[in-house]
Amino acid sequence: MRTYDPTDVSLRRNPYGLLAELRETEPVHWCPPLDAWLLTRYDDVKQAMTAPQLSSDRLRPFYESLKDERRDILSGVMRYLNEWLVFKAPPDHTRLRRMMNPVISPRLVQSMRPSVRAIVDDLLAGVSRDQPFDFVHDVAALLPAYVIMDMLGLARADFDKIKGWSDGLRLFIGTARGVPDKYQRARDGADHLAAYLREQIEQRRRAPTDDVITRMMQAEDEQGKLGEDELIAMCLLILFGGHETTTSLLGSSVAALLAHPSQWTLLRDTPELMPSAVEEFLRYDGPSHSIARVVTESMTWDGQHIKAGDRVFAMVGAANRDPRAFDRPDELDITRSPNRHLTFGQGIHFCLGAPLARLEAQVCIQAMVSGFDRWALDGSEDQAIDWLDAMVMRGPTRLQMRLENTSQT
């Protein structure tokens, strides 16, 4: 039987055939290239998201297993990543989530719809009407970056340097394979981002403003306010989680519609389907490809003995295509209901930024569908689309397309 090898370029393009094979023949699969277990069935992945024997603090055991030289390189990265909500367990997670929920609330997100639409309109106005363009570079990477930077009160002019630093950090967080200097690049990215954010925090100490950084600085519970490292870590999480994952969602959504023109037509003719369509994009080829956990106590899962200390990857992409949970799982159906995809997680680690990601996708895709008569890839799918080299994230890094016979409305 084939195993899952994240260095296999063909799996970057389309991992779903192999994942389906594993799901049907060995749903709890030992993966030698990753030295980890893979879970591929919907019920197993859903259970893994909340199972008490599976810890979300998977970075610390990995870090401690490294050689001294690599630990020294990554110490500056771990200083902040150890404070991320996604790697925390109660009671620390409970405290941080309680403080963050009112800062990034659904009401705040909905109030941002006009500004999100203005950013989308501005980006699409700059897209070439007679030449191919890279949707990821020209739209999908910029929209969530500008939205998040506006929320945090950061200057959009700083985008290029923030993106460069974030790309370095992504090599570590996204579990990129085959990048020899990824730890040093992650360290450099984290160091630069932390220094930049420390300066932003100091500016707001001198002159508070009405932005998310200021509101996080003012948030307080019975244990007091967030410490400076916690503030920097929270800003990093918002920047990274709110930017990288939404970029991937936008790119994958456009790729899915380009591959399914009948669904594009249906969405154009029935715009009220947009919320349902975004949920289907999240299910069909969502940005969360897997979540990693560490086993805290030995267990047996579907006949397989899993030892304490083992790593487990719950393959969200495989679960979202499980025929036990979804009819016609390999078909894109923007009318699908119900749609209980697992892309945003479950339980205490349900994605804090889910409402914002949904809003950005709805506004952007609606503007593209209603504003242009026809889309087309610039060449074959293999020629036009490059995919992330990552284990836990999925999405295009390049998507060359054309807007043909376009007319602005």
Q: Predicted segment positions?
A:
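Cytochrome P450
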Residues: M1-T409
